[in-house]
């Protein structure tokens, strides 16, 4: 099978950098010449490169060929937009038979990122034209000598009944290629297949002899020589492989070609290595300038310092990383991408002894590729923000997990083979694996269950699990692991509990086995908008299946009735361990419905199903493999007993709760506006998950350590409310996968796999905010229906995990009114504080009551987050003001008290307070008097303490704070108190000391008199 992989090449002679720096044609001109040849000369339509993120194929980690974005056409999901196409596709390959990551940088041509030049025909031209175009471009426009070119064609396969492609052979001969240079090869080299089944066909390859030898080199084709390589692969998609492996002709025929851009540039610039071209040389110069290391010399086999290989790896990886991040890939969602980022960081720090080199190189990559891929320039700040975050995370891991892992490797040296040893959960994951080894040794298999636990609980990737399995001599059951991983994603998408997974799987198997038709739920988007309100229809439907306590009923023989009689009939079909009839869970499967099932973070509708005179209350709705199951209970019948019975095949009428649906629509549209506003304000952000209900929206997102300020949150709220006031339309359109790729500035979920058809895009365009998302949820027709938007909460979990809770509509309006009510209370409190000189203890009581009300999480109606924060800040400010006001009042009172025992002739103050100040400290009281020596004692509840102050201009050896306080220490038989940070000659204190009630009066009187006497003696001398 041939999958557009360049043949493995055998290095037969050492390559070194070309000594000539002359560039005959620039890489840019070579690319443009290819595109213009097909666009201008041959009337092809240019379709830009898709992102390197595979949006429609979960079997690949990255887009790895030009044909990926056209698979929907080949699989006949939709018609092509035009019959002739040309493009240059960004591709990434980091694994596979010929793409070992460890080879990159150690040979002349392997890369993680490369460009694939290609042209396509969707039912226009076929073999003859495709071959002629390729030959003409290579020989006449690029000037490659015909003598250096060889072609291969499909030689047939008798087992599959496939004849040699003699038509292709004859075309090459008619073009003028000599017979000895037209060579047949088998399935492996010259037959292309998309997968195990699907479109396929023979291919023809053009090979080039880099040595330009006159002697015929036919015998060396496809033998792995580096000087005789495949240049262009032309695939003729004319067959289809069926699931039984037979191959039959297709009704439509396609041409699909691919040529490696870097290899073509190396050939035309006459370089022996791709790294010697002007694709990589600017990156080498950027590295050398930033790291201040010796220049790149192009050494391969004599590179003892590993500097040149470091140049090559870093240049290659920086291209791959910058392109992948600019295209919306997130390291958190792609272990392979994170692995390469960390490898590049490691080389930058260890080989070039420089931090931040990867971020610096992103500028050079954007300069190099930005003209043909403008998203690199547009998204450069986002790219650099993510690189900064990854560098910081990697550094923290090295300082923590890295040390512990190295200790583990010392105990078990085989663990050195684990490449991603910086994985956060690796250490604990390996300990878990060791614990389970005794159970695994018997089977010699690392089961899907154990592997899934390693991934789900410890975050280990499939690659790391595979490496650990090899170390422990276990076979890794990767298929079982991938199945469990897929089930997890599916459960998460549809909101299915883990405990329901097995049950759901059995039910779906039975439904499909009995060929029960899937539910048509396209009606969920239908409503009539009359300018003010949305009106939802009811639809007539038919019951195709019933689920009672997990048991599926598909035929008319079994029947159930309403709650009063259902248990009697269920005894026939339900075991004795089922719940009582009051708790019976019933699911109704219909052939069509207008109910939205829980999906994409949006909660399901609720409503009713009317069957005859029975009313079934829909509590929640789930969609599993396109079967929509309505879970709920029957309403109590008005009569004591109902003779009506429910059967498969019964007709019914379905309606939804309009208030719930409108609330959900409002909040989902609000979530889109919030997401758009976050992207507008933050450098890099992506939504991790969301929850949309009828009364609230919750968004969890990664901001790569960037936190939102209060002002930014205010701007977000104002921006969204301005869009609501503008009453702009919310439009939707349906596109296919190829059309999706052509959409500019669209928000997609990282790691999400989108279908080939029926992709719904929701757009909101206003003057100051634009939102465009691929979304299957329900939305309002215009933003005015949201009425108001307010944030309810904002908090972070960890360095990058931010959470926002918000509301729109009547819920937001109610929250706003609650907030305004609290604001009025605070304003009244402020007025009282100003006009009534409110006592601090009274103020504190009122203030605390308001604060408790604001922070009460059990409030029936929440207060908007911004109002809450403003109110709490205002209360804190008022508290400070009230405290200052109380202190001033107390200061005035104490000053009057002290003033009463002093007069203008006093040259010192000695006084005792008998009431503990509420707001002033003893130090603050002493500080009232900064120009004269002051000693204040405080007696309260059987204890006495004191503090004194002596001005610096008065302090001396005979009279200073310490010697003055010593008078009191001797009387109370105690020690000095703490005066941390003060000069002991100027400030002194006495430790709090207990004295008896009988002695307090005499001791305090004695202390006052002796302190006065001491001060009088020494101040008189001054």
Where are these predicted regions, by residue range?
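N-terminal chloroplast transit peptides
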Residues: 1-12
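A glycine- and charged-residue-rich anion-binding loop/surface
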Residues: 12-1022
């Amino acid at each position: 099978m041939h999958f557009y992989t360049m043949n493995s090449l055998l290095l037969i002679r050492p390559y070194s950098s070309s000594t000539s720096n002359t560039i005959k044609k620039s890489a840019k001109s070579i690319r443009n010449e290819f595109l213009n040849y097909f666009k201008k000369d041959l009337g092809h339509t240019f379709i830009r490169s898709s992102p390197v993120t595979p949006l429609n194929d979960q079997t690949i980690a990255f887009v790895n060929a030009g044909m990926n974005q056209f698979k929907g056409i080949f699989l006949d999901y939709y018609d092509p937009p035009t019959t002739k196409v040309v493009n240059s596709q960004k591709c990434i390959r980091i694994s596979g038979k010929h793409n070992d990551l460890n080879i990159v940088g150690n040979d002349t041509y392997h890369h993680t990122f490369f460009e694939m030049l290609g042209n396509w025909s969707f039912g226009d031209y076929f073999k003859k034209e495709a071959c002629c175009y390729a030959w003409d471009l290579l020989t006449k426009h690029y000037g490659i000598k015909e003598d250096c070119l060889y072609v291969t064609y499909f030689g047939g396969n008798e087992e599959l009944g496939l004849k040699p492609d003699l038509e292709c052979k004859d075309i090459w001969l008619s073009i003028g290629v000599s017979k000895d240079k037209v060579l047949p090869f088998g399935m492996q080299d010259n037959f292309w297949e998309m997968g195990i089944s699907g479109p396929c066909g023979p291919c023809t390859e053009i090979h080039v002899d880099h040595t330009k030898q006159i002697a015929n080199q036919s015998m060396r084709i496809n033998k792995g020589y580096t000087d005789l390589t495949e240049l262009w692969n032309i695939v003729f998609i004319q067959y289809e492989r069926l699931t039984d492996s037979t191959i039959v002709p297709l009704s439509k025929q396609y041409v699909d070609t691919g040529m490696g851009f870097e290899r073509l540039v190396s050939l035309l610039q006459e370089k022996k290595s791709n790294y010697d071209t002007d694709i990589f040389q600017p990156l080498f110069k950027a590295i050398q300038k930033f790291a201040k290391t010796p220049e790149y010399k192009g050494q391969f086999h004599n590179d003892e310092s590993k500097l040149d290989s470091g140049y090559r790896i870093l240049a290659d990886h920086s291209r791959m990383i910058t392109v992948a991040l600019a295209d919306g890939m997130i390291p958190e969602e792609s272990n392979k991408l994170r692995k390469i980022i960390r490898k590049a960081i490691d080389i930058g720090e260890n080989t070039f002894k420089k931090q931040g080199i990867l971020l610096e190189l992103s500028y050079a990559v954007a300069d190099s590729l930005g003209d043909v891929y403008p998203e690199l320039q547009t998204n450069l700040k986002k790219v650099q923000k993510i690189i900064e975050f990854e560098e910081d995370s990697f550094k923290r891991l090295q300082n923590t997990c890295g040390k512990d892992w190295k200790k583990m490797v010392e105990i078990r040296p085989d663990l050195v083979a684990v490449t991603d040893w910086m994985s956060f959960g690796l250490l604990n994951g390996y300990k878990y694996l060791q614990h389970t080894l005794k159970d695994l040794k018997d089977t010699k298999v690392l089961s899907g269950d154990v592997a899934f636990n390693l991934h789900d609980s410890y975050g280990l990737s499939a690659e790391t699990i595979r490496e650990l399995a090899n170390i422990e001599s276990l076979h890794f059951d990767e298929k079982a692991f991938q199945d469990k991983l897929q089930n997890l994603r599916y459960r998460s998408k549809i909101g299915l509990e883990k405990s329901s997974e097995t049950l759901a799987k059995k039910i779906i198997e039975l439904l499909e086995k009995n060929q029960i038709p899937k539910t048509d739920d396209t009606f969920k988007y239908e409503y009539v908008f009359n300018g003010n309100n949305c009106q939802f229809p009811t639809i007539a439907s038919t019951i195709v299946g019933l689920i009672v306590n997990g048991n599926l009923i598909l035929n008319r023989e079994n029947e159930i009735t309403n709650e009063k009689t259902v248990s009697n009939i269920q005894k026939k079909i339900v075991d004795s361990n089922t719940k009582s009839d009051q708790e019976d869970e019933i699911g109704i499967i219909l052939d069509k419905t207008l109910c939205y099932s829980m999906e994409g973070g949006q909660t399901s509708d609720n409503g009713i199903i009317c069957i005859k005179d029975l009313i079934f209350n829909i509590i929640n709705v789930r969609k599993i493999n396109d079967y929509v199951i309505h879970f709920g209970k029957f309403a109590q019948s008005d009569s004591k007993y109902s003779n009506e019975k429910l059967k498969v095949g019964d007709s019914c009428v379905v309606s939804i709760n309009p208030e719930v649906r409108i609330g959900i629509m409002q909040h989902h549209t609000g979530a889109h506006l919030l997401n758009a506003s976050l992207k507008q304000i933050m450098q890099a952000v992506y939504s991790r998950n969301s929850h949309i209900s009828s009364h609230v929206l919750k968004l969890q997102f990664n901001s790569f350590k960037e936190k939102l300020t209060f002002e930014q949150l205010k701007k977000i709220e104002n921006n969204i409310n301005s869009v609501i006031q503008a009453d702009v339309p919310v439009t939707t359109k349906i596109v296919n996968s190829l059309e999706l790729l052509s959409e500019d500035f669209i928000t997609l979920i990282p790691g999400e796999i989108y279908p080939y058809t029926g992709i719904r895009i929701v757009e909101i365009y206003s003057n100051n905010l634009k939102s465009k998302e691929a979304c299957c949820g329900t939305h309002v027709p215009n933003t005015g229906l949201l009425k108001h938007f307010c944030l309810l909460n904002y908090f972070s979990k960890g360095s990058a995990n931010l959470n926002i809770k918000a509301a729109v509509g009547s819920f937001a309006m109610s929250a706003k009114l609650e907030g305004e009510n609290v604001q009025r209370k605070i304003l009244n409190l402020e007025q009282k504080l100003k006009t009534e000189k409110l006592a601090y203890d009274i103020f504190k009581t009122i203030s605390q009551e308001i604060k408790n009300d604001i922070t009460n999480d059990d409030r029936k109606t929440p207060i908007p987050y911004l109002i809450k924060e403003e109110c709490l800040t205002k209360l804190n400010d008022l508290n400070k003001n009230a405290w200052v006001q109380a202190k001033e009042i107390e200061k005035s009172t104490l000053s009057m008290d002290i003033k009463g025992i002093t007069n203008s002739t006093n040259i010192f103050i000695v006084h005792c307070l008998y009431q503990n100040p509420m707001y002033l400290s003893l130090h603050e009281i002493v500080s009232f008097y900064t120009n004269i020596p002051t000693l204040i004692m405080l007696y309260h509840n059987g204890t006495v303490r004191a503090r004194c102050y002596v001005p610096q201009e008065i302090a001396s050896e005979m009279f200073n704070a310490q010697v003055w306080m010593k008078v009191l220490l001797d009387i109370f038989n105690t020690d000095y108190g703490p005066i941390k940070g003060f000069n002991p000659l100027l400030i002194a204190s006495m430790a709090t000391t207990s004295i008896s009630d009988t002695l307090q009066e005499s001791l305090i009187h004695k202390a006052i008199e002796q302190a006065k006497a001491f001060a009088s003696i020494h101040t008189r001398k001054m």
